[in-house]
């Protein structure tokens, strides 16, 4: 086809393409030039013509051309600078990029070693922009539901076909799960079936736990699914009762009781030989007792040897006569059931019939030790021994028969010695070992623990422990069995068995203080402290080797004798006469035990037997004169205090100068006593001279320096010299914190609180964890006005001293001073829990109880058990010569009345 010629021609003037075909959307008018002023604003039409005429009429001059050239030159220069800057920037970017390439070159090369799995594990980059808002919107959209018409479902989807495929899939899964179940069900002999009906049994357990709960929280679909599964179980193995029981419990849970009963009835027809399904049927009909009796009778006809069904039949009967009748019928069917024989014995009132019944029961079940024990308990002593002898032949490896024999001997003769019972049990262990029985310590201790609370078994329990320990030791198995006895003792509770084990071990090693301490704790916890004292008395004076035991205890463990005397005195509730008799008895074979003599001195002083006390001192001096015994200076110290108690100061001074200081010239206690005697007599100069000579001979004793400084400060009113004395003592003992404390207390007494605070700060820098310094720091708050820092100081003190009981006490005292008694009580109880032997804590605790009006009976009982011994305030009272023979309770009352 030839090209049309008009396509190569020029269009006519005013030609607009498409306008002939009716095209629209464009203007056919000629575009007008829009006139604007210099600032870009549109010029109105009425001024345009005049403006054009004016511009055309105005001629161009050279200045305009020159200005235009200048501006053009400037624009060229600016353009060149801009271009140069861009080139430099590109060069910098190229350099930076090259540096980056070189920096990451090795990393790029290592990418070759990345495996495919590592590459896939690299997390994808996620968009965190407005993530929370997007998630919130998405959650809102997910919660929205919309109603959709059926027309939206495509017509080519076959719903019936889809349902059939789902049912096929579910059926295949059920068949796979039931494969093992069907296999096990078809096997008539199954000793152990851990995998049989596992799913059904687990589901049964869940239904049993939630049987009382409704299915309100389960959907209809889940309920139908469970029904389908259980139906498949029943269909696969209709003779398995677990499927029927599970289905019935499911319907029971769904509150469809009639359906559940119908299912379980069908199950009873399918599985009449299963006692479980009959019991489930009885449970579902438990409201109808008469029908339950019918069911249990039918069940017993099918299962006459099921003990559970017979026990259920017994429970359904309401009268004892009917119960006994059912029990007798059950025994005809199951004569070897121990529980039925026990029920029969409990229902029988005639003793003769019970004996006959137990005789028959032991013939059917000779291995039942409970029936044998009940049988021998009703027999006479002679007949019981014959019965046990016959059973030893039937059961030659049964150790319980020998234990029953021991109980029989104890019941027949309550005063029988333990040694005879031990011999009987050891004979039994020998016979058992001949028949292949191997005795173990743990097994026999468990047998003893089983008799721990049984009546008339105390001697037998002890004999079992003694017999097994002696048997293991004599049979050569001591190392293998008894090496772990400590671990066994730690796991055992405080009981008669533990006490018996400890007593036997102590008999083998009477000087073991650890075993004695354990025995003391066990007897105290079990409230058998008199048993500890009787055992002590037996070892020391009543056994064949008592002389050897006393000698070993005197040489190796003299503290055990003191423990015996102390516990005896507590048990006698302060009976001084009986305790003094015991002390004299022990002193006869342990004359050099000073602790016993000190205890006797304390008892004679508290009972105010001063003449006997003076005679005892003289007798002690004469008996120990030719022996060098450690602790003699304590004896002299107590004698000086005894003289001071009677105001025999001159005699005390003479005794100190002629005997004490000559025998012990560097004992600081004698210098302190001598100085205190002179001070009490008003001879201040001699008192100061005594302390001064003491500091020269014993310069490392801070008490002498402190006593000397107090003479100058308080008595001689010379605080400057007192400070100098403490400074000299500190120079000779730079690491003794007591000098800092003495200086701080002196400044507080003198009213120099700033100086005292400075000394505390200096001392804490050197001894940051010393509790006594922190106590002084807390005491300064009572004299100053820095209560705002109190909490901070408390926290620092507790942290640095690790909650020391003295710091806890001082915090409680500070709250007591502010009348915050409840808060003070809490801190004082914490301090007491931390250390119960600190006497000052008890004093302030009783003061707080008095302020709060609380009952102190229990607190006094705790106080009597603890017997506090130290604390500044407590020692100041207890070491007072006029109060040295006071009881702890008397000292407590005196201190409580002081404030």
UniProtKB/Swiss-Prot annotation:
The residue ranges flagged as biased composition, category Basic and acidic residues, are: 28-51
Instruction: State the UniProt keywords alphabetically.
Output: mRNA processing, mRNA splicing, Nucleus, Repeat, Spliceosome
Q: What's in the GO CC field?
A: catalytic step 2 spliceosome; nucleus; spliceosomal complex; U4/U6 snRNP; U4/U6 x U5 tri-snRNP complex; U5 snRNP
* Matching Pfam families: PRP1_N
Which residue stretches belong to region Disordered? 1-65
**Signal peptide boundaries:** none
HAT repeats by residue range: 221-253, 255-287, 289-318, 319-350, 352-381, 383-414, 493-525, 545-578, 608-645, 648-680, 682-714, 751-783, 819-851
| Domain of life, per lineage | Eukaryota
Concerning InterPro entries, the annotation shows: HAT (IPR003107), PRP1_N (IPR010491), Syf1-like (IPR045075), TPR-like_helical_dom_sf (IPR011990), TPR_rpt (IPR019734)
Example GO BP:
mRNA splicing, via spliceosome
Primary location class: nucleus
Cellular location of this protein?
Nucleus
Question: Subunit arrangement?
Answer: Component of the U4/U6-U5 tri-snRNP complex composed of the U4, U6 and U5 snRNAs and at least PRP3, PRP4, PRP6, PRP8, PRP18, PRP31, PRP38, SNU13, SNU23, SNU66, SNU114, SPP381, SMB1, SMD1, SMD2, SMD3, SMX2, SMX3, LSM2, LSM3, LSM4, LSM5, LSM6, LSM7, LSM8, BRR2 and DIB1.
User: What miscellaneous comment appears in this entry?
Assistant: Present with 2250 molecules/cell in log phase SD medium.
Tell me, in a sentence or two, what this protein's role is.
Participates in pre-mRNA splicing. Part of the U4/U5/U6 tri-snRNP complex, one of the building blocks of the spliceosome.
The record's section on PANTHER family has:
PRE-MRNA SPLICING FACTOR (PTHR11246), PRE-MRNA-PROCESSING FACTOR 6 (PTHR11246:SF1)
Q: Name it.
A: Pre-mRNA-splicing factor 6
Q: Which organism is it from?
A: Saccharomyces cerevisiae (strain ATCC 204508 / S288c)
Task: From the UniProt record, report the name of the gene that encodes this protein.
Answer: PRP6
């Amino acid at each position: 086809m030839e090209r049309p010629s008009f396509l190569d021609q020029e269009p006519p003037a005013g030609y607009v393409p498409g306008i002939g075909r009716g095209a629209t959307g464009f203007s056919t008018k000629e575009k007008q030039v829009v006139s604007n002023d210099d600032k870009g604003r549109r010029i109105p039409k009425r001024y345009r013509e005049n403006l054009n005429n004016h511009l055309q009429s105005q001629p161009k001059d050279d200045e305009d051309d020159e200005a235009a050239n200048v501006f053009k030159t400037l624009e060229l220069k600016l353009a060149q600078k801009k271009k140069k800057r861009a080139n430099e920037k590109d060069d910098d970017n190229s350099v930076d990029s090259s540096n980056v390439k070189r920096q990451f070159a090795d990393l790029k090369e290592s990418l070759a070693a990345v495996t495919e799995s590592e590459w896939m594990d690299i997390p994808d980059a996620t968009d965190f922009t407005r993530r929370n808002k997007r998630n919130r919107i998405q959650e809102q959209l997910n919660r929205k539901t919309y109603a959709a018409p059926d027309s939206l479902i495509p017509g080519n989807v076959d719903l019936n076909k889809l349902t059939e495929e789902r049912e096929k899939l579910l059926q295949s899964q059920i068949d796979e799960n039931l494969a093992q179940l069907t296999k096990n069900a078809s096997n008539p002999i199954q000793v152990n079936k851990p995998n049989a009906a596992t799913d059904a049994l687990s589901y049964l357990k869940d239904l049993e736990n939630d049987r009382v709960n409704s299915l309100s929280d389960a959907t209809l679909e889940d309920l139908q699914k469970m029904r389908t599964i259980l139906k498949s179980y029943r269909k696969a193995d209709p003779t398995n009762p677990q499927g029927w029981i599970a289905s019935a419990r499911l319907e029971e849970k769904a509150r469809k009781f009639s359906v559940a009963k119908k299912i379980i009835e069908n199950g009873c027809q399918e599985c009449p030989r299963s006692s479980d399904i009959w019991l489930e049927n009885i449970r579902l009909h438990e409201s109808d007792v008469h029908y339950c009796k019918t069911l249990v009778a039918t069940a017993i006809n099918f299962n006459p040897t099921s003990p559970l069904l017979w026990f259920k039949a017994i429970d359904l009967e309401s009268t004892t006569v009917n119960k006994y009748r059912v029990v007798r019928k059950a025994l005809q069917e199951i004569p070897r059931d121990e529980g039925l024989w026990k029920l029969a014995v409990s229902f029988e009132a005639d003793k003769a019939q019970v004996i006959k019944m137990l005789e028959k029961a032991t013939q059917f079940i000779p291995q039942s030790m409970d029936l044998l024990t009940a049988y021998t308990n009703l027999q006479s002593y002679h007949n019981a021994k014959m019965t046990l002898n016959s059973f030893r032949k039937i059961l030659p490896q049964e150790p319980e028969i020998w234990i029953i024999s021991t109980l029989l001997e104890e019941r027949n003769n309550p005063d029988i010695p333990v040694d005879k019972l031990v011999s009987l049990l050891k004979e039994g262990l020998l016979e058992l070992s001949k028949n292949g029985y191997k005795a173990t310590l743990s097994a026999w201790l468990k047998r003893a623990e089983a008799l721990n609370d049984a009546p008339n078994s105390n001697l037998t329990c002890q004999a079992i422990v003694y017999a097994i320990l002696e048997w293991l030791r004599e049979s050569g198995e001591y190392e293998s069995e008894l090496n772990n006895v400590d671990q066994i003792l730690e796991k055992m509770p405080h009981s008669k068995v533990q006490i018996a084990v400890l007593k036997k071990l102590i008999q083998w090693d009477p000087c073991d203080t650890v075993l004695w301490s354990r025995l003391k704790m066990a007897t105290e916890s079990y409230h058998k402290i008199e048993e500890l004292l009787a055992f002590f008395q037996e070892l020391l004076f009543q056994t064949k080797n008592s002389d050897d035991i006393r000698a070993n205890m005197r040489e190796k463990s003299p503290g055990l004798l003191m423990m015996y005397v102390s516990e005896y005195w507590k048990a006698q509730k302060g009976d001084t006469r009986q305790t003094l008799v015991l002390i004299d008895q022990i002193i006869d074979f342990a004359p050099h035990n000073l602790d016993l003599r000190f205890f006797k001195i304390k008892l004679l002083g508290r009972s105010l037997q001063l003449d006997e006390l003076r005679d005892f001192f003289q007798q002690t001096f004469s008996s120990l004169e030719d022996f060098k015994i450690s602790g003699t200076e304590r004896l002299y110290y107590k004698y000086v205090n005894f003289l001071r108690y009677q105001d025999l100061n001159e005699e005390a001074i003479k005794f100190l100068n002629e005997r004490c200081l000559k025998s012990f010239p560097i004992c600081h206690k004698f210098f302190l006593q001598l100085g205190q005697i002179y001070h009490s007599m008003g001879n201040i100069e001699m008192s100061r001279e005594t302390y001064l000579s003491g500091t020269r001979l014993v310069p490392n004793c801070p008490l002498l320096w402190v006593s000397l400084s107090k003479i100058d400060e308080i008595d001689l009113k010379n605080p400057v010299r007192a400070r100098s004395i403490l400074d000299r003592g500190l120079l000779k003992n730079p690491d003794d914190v007591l000098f800092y404390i003495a200086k701080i207390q002196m400044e507080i007494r003198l009213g120099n609180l700033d100086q005292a605070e400075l000394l505390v700060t200096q001392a804490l820098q050197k001894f940051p964890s010393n509790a006594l310094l922190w106590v002084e720091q807390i005491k300064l708050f009572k004299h100053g006005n820095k209560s705002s820092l109190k909490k901070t100081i408390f926290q620092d003190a507790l942290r640095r001293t690790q909650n020391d009981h003295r710091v806890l006490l001082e915090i409680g005292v500070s709250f007591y001073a502010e009348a915050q008694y409840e808060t003070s009580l809490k801190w004082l109880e914490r301090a007491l829990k931390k250390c119960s032997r600190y006497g000052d804590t008890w004093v302030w605790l009783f003061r707080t109880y008095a302020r709060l009006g609380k009952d102190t009976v229990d607190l006094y009982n705790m106080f009597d058990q603890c017997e506090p011994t130290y604390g500044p305030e407590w020692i100041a009272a207890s070491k007072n010569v006029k109060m040295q023979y006071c009881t702890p309770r008397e000292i407590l009352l005196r201190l409580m009345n002081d404030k």
